[in-house]
Amino acid sequence: MNFQENLAALDLEYLWHPCSQMQEHQNFPIIPIKKAQGIYLYDFNDNAYMDLISSWWVNLFGHNNAYISQQLKNQIDDLEHVLLASFSHKPIITLSQRLCQLTHMDKCFYADNGSSCVEIALKMSYHAHFLKNQTRRKKLFLSLSNSYHGETLGALSVGDVKLYKDTYTPLLLKNLTTPVPKNDHEIENSLNALKRLLDKHSEEICAFIAEPLLQCAGNMHIYSARYLKQAVLLCKQKNIHIIFDEIATGFGRTGSMFAYEQCEIKPDFLCLSKGISGGYLPLSALLTHNEIYNQFYAPYEENKAFLHSHSYTGNALACACANATLDIFEKENVIEKNKALSGFIFNTLQNALKPLMEQQVVSDLRHLGMVFAFEVFIQTKERLSLAVFKKTLKKGLLLRPLNNTIYLMPPYIITHEEVKKAVAGLVEILDELRKG
């Protein structure tokens, strides 16, 4: 047993991995990673893997990015962490100012992961309505079908992906779901369904929560900005808060800095995480407006404070990485560069997959910014997603399909040559699976 195999065996003995059926790893070994550089992960046998999903959608500018790493090292020498109640630090003050300026919002509230950020938004919306109207009638949340907002109980309550939700349904909050349009032909029907729901329940609804334009864990479903804009206007007319979950879609992933910018509307609450620290350290931020903040601003005796906290809220090291990430966006014209890069990736996929599309093995090739996805229809002995995952690893590619949806969300530093190599390898794998 070599060093890599020994580590994998120890892993199985002591670790329980997320979103994994551990029994499968008895025959399909876990891969311990020794180091990473750029878009590549390296195991202890020096095998390289192209990280084509940005390590669960977090890594924007490559692993071991020289600039972000240096800023992190600089911060370690000054301050690693301090509680954020009654204390603060320069990295978080700078980051908060920059995020507010980027989003044209007023205040930042921090946590350390996306699900917690959603929980904060739900609590804050409910609490703000209560403080303003002194009524507890507004206690429901409205979300889109096929949506995903995290895996804590509150976040699961406003999600609609059965794989994650069904087991825990008896524990979840009662909420409302309105249909997301599957295509532009369904926009009017979806809006009419929303109108009927609002006519019946608007007095009970705290907030409408949505992932703008792209439902990532919902098989990378892209939906209309026109629908979202109209849905938001309908909710606003009924005094319903708007929560945009940009945990996965923020920081350039959909082609603009934030996806909601493409809808020309602003939320009451904006949830950010994943790419915020460039993929280095856990961090999330909820942004809101002074109109919300002022509901809580009062003498202590009035008991209006928002009492929510996490031990590592606003960690100084994570904030230093986030500031470094924003520096790169500012200095390197990332959004404009990504427009050209995303076009190249899509065209490469389109050309390479054309024969498989003609054979109806592949369909619905789509992209939004730096997100690319398509459906695969191949019969395999084991489930398709696992078969693709295994074969791509052997080709040196890291992909984790969602059911029959294969997607790419690569770091923004991927080169044209790396794109061509990755796509060629992927097509070879699909051909192998098709031929059995």
Curated annotation (Swiss-Prot):
Binding residues for pyridoxal 5'-phosphate: G114, S115, D245
Gene3D superfamilies, A to Z: Aspartate Aminotransferase, domain 1 (3.90.1150.10), Type I PLP-dependent aspartate aminotransferase-like (Major domain) (3.40.640.10)
Top-level taxonomic group: Bacteria
Pfam family for this entry, one: Aminotran_3
One GO CC term, this protein: cytoplasm
Site feature location: Participates in the substrate recognition with KAPA and in a stacking interaction with the adenine ring of SAM: C19
InterPro entries cross-referenced by the UniProt entry: Aminotrans_3, Aminotrans_3_PPA_site, BioA, PyrdxlP-dep_Trfase, PyrdxlP-dep_Trfase_major, PyrdxlP-dep_Trfase_small
Main localization category: cytoplasm
Molecular-function GO terms, alphabetical: adenosylmethionine-8-amino-7-oxononanoate transaminase activity; pyridoxal phosphate binding
Needed co-factor(s): pyridoxal 5'-phosphate
GO BP annotation list: biotin biosynthetic process
Binding site for substrate: W56, Y148, K274, S309, R400
Enzyme Commission numbers on file: 2.6.1.62
Keyword terms: Aminotransferase, Biotin biosynthesis, Cytoplasm, Pyridoxal phosphate, S-adenosyl-L-methionine, Transferase
Biochemical pathway: Cofactor biosynthesis; biotin biosynthesis; 7,8-diaminononanoate from 8-amino-7-oxononanoate (SAM route): step 1/1
TM regions (residue ranges): none
SUPFAM superfamilies, A to Z: PLP-dependent transferases
Catalyzed reactions: (8S)-8-amino-7-oxononanoate + S-adenosyl-L-methionine = S-adenosyl-4-methylsulfanyl-2-oxobutanoate + (7R,8S)-7,8-diammoniononanoate
CDD domains: OAT_like
Record's subunit section: Homodimer.
Family: Belongs to the class-III pyridoxal-phosphate-dependent aminotransferase family. BioA subfamily.
Function: Catalyzes the transfer of the alpha-amino group from S-adenosyl-L-methionine (SAM) to 7-keto-8-aminopelargonic acid (KAPA) to form 7,8-diaminopelargonic acid (DAPA). It is the only aminotransferase known to utilize SAM as an amino donor.
NCBIfam families in the record: bioA (TIGR00508), PRK05964.1 (NF004624)
HAMAP family: BioA (MF_00834)
Annotated protein name in UniProt: Adenosylmethionine-8-amino-7-oxononanoate aminotransferase
Species name: Helicobacter pylori (strain ATCC 700392 / 26695)
